[in-house]
UniProtKB/Swiss-Prot annotation:
Protein name, entry field: Serine/threonine-protein kinase AKL1
Tagged with keyword Ion transport: no
Catalyzed reactions: L-seryl-[protein] + ATP = O-phospho-L-seryl-[protein] + ADP + H(+); L-threonyl-[protein] + ATP = O-phospho-L-threonyl-[protein] + ADP + H(+)
Residues that bear N-acetylserine: 2
Gene3D superfamilies associated with the record: Transferase(Phosphotransferase) domain 1
A Pfam cross-reference name: Pkinase
Family annotation (SUPFAM superfamilies): Protein kinase-like (PK-like) (SSF56112)
Residues that bind ATP: 41-49, 70
Compositionally biased tracts (Polar residues): 493-513, 781-791, 810-819, 935-976
Family annotation (InterPro entries): Kinase-like_dom_sf (IPR011009), Prot_kinase_dom (IPR000719), Ser/Thr_kinase_AS (IPR008271)
Amino acid sequence: MSITNGTSRSVSAMGHPAVERYTPGHIVCVGTHKVEVVNYLAEGGFAQIYVVKFLEYLNEFDNTASVPLKIGDVACLKRVLVQDENGLNEMRNEVEVMKKLKGAPNIVQYFDSNASRRRDGVQGFEVLLLMELCPNKSLLDYMNQRLSTKLTEAEIVKIMYDVALSISQMHYLPVSLIHRDIKIENVLVDAKNNFKLADFGSTSTCFPIVTTHQDIALLTQNIYVHTTPQYRSPEMIDLYRCLPINEKSDIWALGVFLYKLLFFTTPFEMTGQFAILHSKYEFPVNKYSSKLINLIIIMLAENPNLRPNIYQVLYHLCEILNVEVPIEDKYAEGAYNFSKYTQFQNKLQNVQLQMYQLQQKKIMQNNKLSDSEENLLNDMFLSSFEISSKLPMNASDGHAAVSRIPSQNVGQELEEEKESQSDQRKSTLSEDKSSRTTSNANSSGTANNPQEINTIQSPGIEDKSIFENKTPGELYYPSVSELDTYLDKELVKQSSDPTISEQSPRLNTQSLPQRQKSTSSYSSGGRSMKSTSYGAATIGSDEALANEKTAGINKMKQHKSNNPFPKMNVAYHSTNELSNDASNFFLEEQQQGQRYQQAQNQTGTQGNTFPDESQYQSRVEQQQQQQDQPKGPANYSQRNFYTGRDRSNKPMQLGGTIAGDSGNRRVNFQNISQNYATNSQSGYLPSQNSPAIPMVRPVISMNQQQAQQIQAQQLQAQQMQAKQQMQAKQQMQVQQQLQVQQQMQIQNANNNGTYVSDRTNHTTEDMRNAQGGEPPILAGNSANEPMHSSSKNEALLIELSPLKEDAGKQSFQDTNEPQTGGIEDAGGSGTIKGSNNNRNGVLNLSLNEMDLSRDDTGAAVSSFSSSSSSASIQQAKLSGRKGSSKRNNYSTDELGDSMVSSESIDIDLDDARRGKTAERRPLHNERGHKDQARSSDASKSNQFKSKDFSSVSTRQPRQSLDLNFQEVNLSSPTLTQEHRNKNDSPAPNSHHSYRVSPHASTAITENKRHSTGHELSTRSNGKHETHRTGSKQRHDLERYRHSKDKDSNSSITISTSTPSEMRKSFARARQSLDLERVRREAMASSASSSGGSNGKRRSFFSVFRSEK
């Protein structure tokens, strides 16, 4: 074909490639007709319309038209480009329909057609259709010319008559055809101003009742493609009504057509498909005759059985025109009986009014009605059963249909029916067809007969159907049991990411809305129905009713979809997906919390045994990771922890108040490490605004890994302490001390030989005990553990709180707080004393002088238990020292008697070697005065002697301790308080050597006080407190200088020596920058002090006091 203008236009709005137009004068052969293009007329989505002039027949013998074209006649050429065989078949269908309607009145006439493959190298076909030309364009153009004046009633009747007559030609065929796309745009106006029906591309035969989901899906897609939304009938929109799509659908479209002729808009323009389903519309104020209005009313009846047939429509129009009906009554029903419709409508409206009144009464009476009124209400639902019965599934088709296409649940159906009820109540003033009463009648049965609903089962649904026919994008919602199994596995992993099962743990598959898909931008059928979720009880509400239309039918009706075009919404997903990230996240947290509680309850019943070392190691690693970052000690903001039950954002309290404070028990802190790890992963970081302990990053602290491990050990130690007996506690303390000594021996190879082995044995035993959940609980710990005031409280908390993995961290947290009164007020001082007495047997001299006995012993036990759970013995030793210091805080009366103080001193020396000694030794500033009196009681120290300590004494751990303690001038229990004051003052002063904020220093002093070795306390504090000194020497200097200069930093009263002694100690501190020198002096003094005159031991600090 020659192209002269060179212009090209897009063939369709769907993005098809541009196609060149025919130019005027172009010759085209259509079948046996040769035509010449006169001009381009219009273009549609797939077609181009030309005005052509008939030239000649290519074959006279092929001319079979009843009214043949004459040469020179003008015709219309429709050029359609189709992409595939499907498009070609549709065009073939249109041609066939037009051939059948050739010669019929008010139908656009067909002349000829031709189909061929495209010649421009593009895949597809070109279809040419030659037909009658209507020069006055379409009815839409005709109406657009009358926008201001509107159409007169005569014009409307004329148009309706012509269109109804054309439709009758289709309905009266031997096999009735339905146009399915009757609308203003498809009516053309010929040269004589007659109105003719065109565009038969959507025409089809009547559709049988479809009952299977697959058939419904296919028909839904077909309807969507070939019909116009505003003209669709209710049975087209809701195929689950199982109503036939036949000539009555054309009658509905014709009623919308008439409404638009009157009011230039469709009745459902502003309301949508649900208004169509219930035929809810209104008439604007108008001056049209009631005959036209009534005709609209009966044609727009929701019940297709109440709509007139085409003969009755024509009869009514002819009655208005006062002409004879041009067709005979094929249906033999005569004229439409308006009285019948009025009677039906009045009855329906009366029932609706009564139902409305009963519903209002029910609401006023708190949803209660008498039995008679309830039965009446149900009967009214039945009596308002307006639409033809919803046919259940065929027995043969139902099983297969259900197995491959699920239905929605009854709950959704009931909600729909309630909506229809409200629509019915509101429809008493409308003249349109009765509202959808089938669902109303059914709702009465389903709502009031739940047993029937439960007994009716879907014939084809099996459990496996839930998993079948799931498309890749389909979501699966497991059952609760599956979720439990999944959570049990995930609990070990402690994954912080909510899974799908966790997002919707309580959802049944039947409660999920039907998922909708689309195979194309305009398709709504196909296999999408297979992807919908299965309902456990897919029951048609009609089956629950004893309605005569459904009685005796054992098949099941799947509930209809609210969305008549389920395949359109590609991105449509379950409504549950939006709320999963938030609510299910907390479901997950709650479930995990419950499992933690269960695990704790189990541990509590089993004697509060601790997890295996491997598990504990993993937890310690988590704690270490947490502790690598600066953070508040352990009293994090409670809102950061989900699993805790008794958490409060209160600052750490003194031991005296904490002892009985169950509200501040360590419920939350036991699980801090894990919680913090998971919270940090999920974006929740613990608050660093710890109320009592300022967070400081240690500049010069022990190895962070060790410190972290020590903290973790402390946390666990306290936890284990809550469950053990005093004897076991004492043993644990002794073992911790041994561990401390062993560490010092490892560091100081000179003295460590036998002592290390002894300590190693004890540490292993302690670790076993700790794993067995036997580490003793010292009442003194209550002072340090505001969250665990007593073992009783701990037992309760175990049930309520998550697993107690952070006992070490608890003690650490507690020690950070100032506890001036806590030492004396600690509830468990008596028990601590007993333990301390045992230690005094071994370390009477050192402990009495240092006043660390009780605190150190308690901390030693706790830290030892924590260390026992950890893999490293050194960590255990360090933790033992720290833990002992904690316990010493609880009862300062017995400080002088415990080995812990000596051990703590050893630890301090080790730390000094590391640059930490000066920092970690802060001995009890508070103890200074209190401990003097307490230490003065040698009898107390003797009381503290125990079996365990006696065994320790045989080992003579003194040698390792002597290095550190002899300089402290630790004396026998009979030492004068003056010596004690001296010893105590430097220790707390050294404790203050940390240049930390007043609160931090206070916490540090207490921590050091609590920890015998002071290392543990300093380490734990070191995590949270910054040592501002820049070097080891600097630490030593600052320790001793600030121990005296900055005693005010500590909330604990410090017993200081005379000013001259303080000056001398400062001088010594300056001279002690060389730690090696100090160590050598300590070693030298250890030998002399062990057998020194007066039977006194010389402590590390004695180096600074020697020159008085």
